[in-house]
Amino acid sequence: VMSWVAAGFAIAGFAIVHIVLSRGMMRVAAAILTVFAILAAAIGIDQSYGEYATIGSLFGEDSYSQADLTGLAKRKDLITVAQWRKQAANGTIRNIPANGTVNKIDIPATKSQFEARKALVYLPPAALADSKRKPALPVVLMLSGQPGSPGRVFQAGGIQTMMDGYAKTHDGLAPIVIAADQLGADSHNTLCVDSKVYGNALTYRRTWSTG
């Protein structure tokens, strides 16, 4: 990261000197070089952190589709992880997907009336397998920093790649990961409290599973 910063400042500084001292096309070329130096440094730094995976993510956009949760198993139909692994070892579970999925979900704010953005949920292969009885899986809840969003949690954190890697060596098993939104917007610093400025973020967090 520091090398990108140093290189960017060095090239931009060199170009700015030529903008001041040069004339005509040399000045134009130096101005263009300044822009490219700053842009290249910014891209290099972002590659190190993985904060913005796409151009759209700069503007809060993402490519995730709405989740279809109608086919998820009900609590009474769940089996233990040990039972699942035994069935997987016996070959009685078929069509376990190679990868999990990441989709948008709505977490109702019935009690808090907090204007949250859509959350993201990662479902591991075991939750998507062609099996009537799915395993009971742990749920990991993640929140972004500020500025931030559920999408940036998944992109910058490489959540799907990490979880899929774990699932590949554990019969499709991995935690369900939910990135909820406690901010409402990148520019809002709710401090996870109820306030007149940004709404009832604390109440939303306390009741996120029930609305």
Give residue spans per PLM region.
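Non-catalytic cap/lid and distal C-terminal segments of serine-dependent acyl enzymes
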Residues: V1-G211
